[in-house]
Amino acid sequence: MVLVVDYGSQYSRLITRRIRENEVYSEVVFPDDKVDLSKVDTVILSGGPRSVYEEDAPKLPEWFQEYKGPVLAICYGMQLIVKELGGEVRRGRGEYGRTLVELSRDPIFEGIPEKVHVWMSHGDEVVRLPEGFHPIAVSETGVIAAATDGKRFWLLQFHPEVHHTEYGDRMISNFLFNVCKLEKNWKIGDLVEEKIRHIKETIGNKKAILALSGGVDSSVAAVLVHRAIGKNLVCVFVDHGLLRKNEREEVERVFKEHFDMNLVVVDARKRFLEKLRGVTDPEKKRKIIGEEFIRVFEEEAKKHDVEFLVQGTIYSDVIESAASGKTTAKIKSHHNVGGLPEKMNLKLVEPLRDLFKDEVRKVGKYLGIPDRIINRHPFPGPGLAVRVLGEVTEEKLEILREADYIFIETLRKHDYYDKVWQAFAVLLPIKSVGVKGDARAYEYVVALRAVNSVEGMTADWSRIPHDILDEAARRITREVKGVGRVVYDITSKPPATIEWE
């Protein structure tokens, strides 16, 4: 296993992803976490926002003295190793963004041109290497960009894990296979069979319950656990009235008919809309929906003799939750059932907690889940309630449902749905003047939103061809009663979030 020690870098998860893309297993830990070194083949120290000379700056983990294997240290990690081994780091002019570096011959740079552009993000710089180290890359400003002792330590001042670094993927694979001599051991088929065995051992002949949303994570978790315990898994699908068009019918068709699951559908549309009446604040809407969802789920769970709660938590959720108390601030409340295990005295099973989203999709494909489910765009837990800006009403939901359906249908028609990470419609709380026939119209405005992203942490607005947008806009204004204007959102994240609320 490759262990990535996270020093607060926004790119730490990317390091783990790049390693797994090479079919080598990797996990993220924090410097103060306990580690079983018997399972560790290689350690990577991430970057971070701190200076190694700050009084409370993160240090090397306690277990690091016992670890004797190869180390790749990136950015802050490089500076930390240099300082700890007797070199010198000091405040420099800083290098940020795309930077040209000149590489020397080294196994980590095999097959890479002598000069490449890399992604820098550092204020401190190494001015003297520890004894036994030599530089293997220098930046255009003369700063040491990489160094090694040729035995155990490889230090990179830049970030090979980001796409902005040319040949970054090659550098990581060179380190894994040329330097560390690791073997590829991260196979989806073996992984799935091992997870099924583990679920059987954990749950046995007992019953488990799962809140099925129809999204990728809960769907894959449901099929995986169903493969292990069959009808002893009770899947609860709550129709809160905030779903996309035909969503409930599709979930019933796939999971009840195709997979023959024990699926319970709860029609709670009236109670959710009643709770949301008059509410306009997005944070209040999210909170109301989350709390009401838990009430509905609890009521249903009491009808079944269950001991386990299955959740579709994935690895990015685990890392963000672990980090949230350390460095991150809350942007939005996330609608989930995280409080249910304690409230209901259920044992928690999270079969996907060590997988990233793309790996979850691979597991889903292996399990035979239809591509239409596997490749679905992300959908917020509060559903259309956070895409109807302002108060949520049945009329507004129906307008948005139809507009969103037309937008997605148009993207699919032109084979563009899978080219964007997420696409949806938003109903704005304003009306605008228009002309329909010979009469004046005063109708709602719909905003279309489409973004490209990897994990949703950052996102760029999608450059959808104008003829596709034109077709969607014409259909929406023609076919959806109450809509007189369509606009396209061209804001990236940051500064905006992907969802409007």
From Swiss-Prot:
Please tell me where ATP binds in this chain: 213-219
Supply the alphabetized keyword list: ATP-binding, Glutamine amidotransferase, GMP biosynthesis, Ligase, Nucleotide-binding, Purine biosynthesis
Known EC number? 6.3.5.2
Q: Which reaction does it catalyse?
A: XMP + L-glutamine + ATP + H2O = GMP + L-glutamate + AMP + diphosphate + 2 H(+)
Locate the Glutamine amidotransferase type-1 domain: which residues? Answer: 1-185
> Sorted alphabetically, which InterPro entries does this protein's record hold?
Arginosuc_syn_N, Class_I_gatase-like, GATASE, GMP_synth_C, GMP_synth_GATase, GMP_synthase, GMPS_ATP_PPase_dom, Rossmann-like_a/b/a_fold
Active site residues per record: 75 (nucleophile), 159, 161
Give the GMPS ATP-PPase domain ranges: 186-376
Cellular component GO terms, alphabetical:
cytosol
Q: Which GO terms describe its molecular function?
A: ATP binding; GMP synthase activity
**Is Glycoprotein tagged as a keyword?**
no
Which pathway is this protein assigned to?
Answer: Purine metabolism; GMP biosynthesis; GMP from XMP (L-Gln route): step 1/1
Per the entry, what this protein does is:
Catalyzes the synthesis of GMP from XMP.
The entry describes its oligomerization and partners as: Homodimer.
What name has this protein been given in UniProt?
GMP synthase [glutamine-hydrolyzing]
Recorded source organism is Thermotoga petrophila (strain ATCC BAA-488 / DSM 13995 / JCM 10881 / RKU-1)
Q: What is the lineage of its organism?
A: Bacteria, Thermotogati, Thermotogota, Thermotogae, Thermotogales
User: What gene is this protein translated from?
Assistant: guaA
